[in-house]
A protein has these predicted regions:
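A glycine-rich beta-to-alpha transition motif near the start of alpha/beta enzyme domains, typified by
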Residues: 1-109
Length: 109
């Protein structure tokens, strides 16, 4: 009988936090791959996308619970932190970097 081997698992620290009406993982930028395609793959895996229920990740199967915040030390004077928001598609292997989310941002404060 063939033994099924799980995909490689990589530990990446994060905090699962609610910000306003949204919730999701908050990652430190330094803990994620610098390469955008690799970073997208990590976020898709972390949320369990693409799967309508996101059963293999920490996404909640809905756009409100498939959001990611990435935080880094400020890269410019006058700012406390750098914040990057990602909307992870629930049922497609797609990470949208164009929107913003004030709810997730409130969790950074």
């Amino acid at each position: 009988m063939d033994q099924i081997r799980p995909a490689a698992v990589r530990k990446i620290p994060c905090v699962l936090m609610r910000g306003g009406t949204s919730r999701g993982p908050y990652f430190l930028e330094r803990d994620l791959p610098a390469d955008p395609a690799a970073r997208d793959r990590v976020l898709l895996a972390a949320t369990g996308s693409p799967h309508s229920l996101q059963v293999d990740g920490i996404g909640g199967g809905h756009a409100l619970t498939s959001k990611v915040a990435i935080v880094a030390p400020a890269s410019r004077p006058g700012a406390d932190v750098d914040y990057l928001f990602a909307q992870v598609s629930v049922d497609r292997a797609f990470v949208d970097w164009s929107p913003n989310c004030g709810n997730m941002l409130s969790g950074v404060a």
